[in-house]
């Protein structure tokens, strides 16, 4: 059974490149493309894909608003933010909006495919370049204080510390 994808980006070259790349991955099928958040919500309502790759900054409706709508209407649909924004506050906002992943457009194509596979396996995926900042933000939040709680299992915590180690080694 293939993973059904909707690709959402307001830049035609990016959207078409992603769709073309994913269409060559054996277990993945691009079932729709959207140019903004409103189109993405409509496509998800019609097609019920497994995963939506979502740009965040788009006209008409931004990716964060679209993510909230998609996740509230269709909890089984996984949204992966794919953006240029590495700012910690935007990453946190996307995760709190319901994104199952946050990947940077500077990522290698194989990393984006791995991210889609990870969210399909029930995991949360975050680009290594921003993982440390996300863990720092959520570890500083009081437990049970809000409606959204992030469950970091020991494996996920060890993954985060591996990213920390990799970042430190790269920064040296």
Region roles according to the model:
Residues 47-53:
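Active-site beta3 strand of CheY-like receiver
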Residues 89-96, 101, 106-152, 157, ...:
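Short, flexible helix-to-coil linker/hinge segments that flank and couple to helix-turn-helix
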Residues 36-39, 62-65:
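Acidic catalytic/metal-coordinating carboxylates
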Residues 58:
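Receiver (REC) domain active-site loop signature in two-component systems and cognate sites
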Residues 54-55, 66:
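Active-site T/S-Asp motif of two-component receiver
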Residues 27-35, 43:
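Short hydrophobic/Thr-rich beta-strand motif most characteristic of the beta2 strand and flanking loop
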Residues 2-14, 18-22:
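Conserved acidic segment of CheY-like receiver
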Residues 9, 55, 83:
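Active-site residues of response regulator receiver
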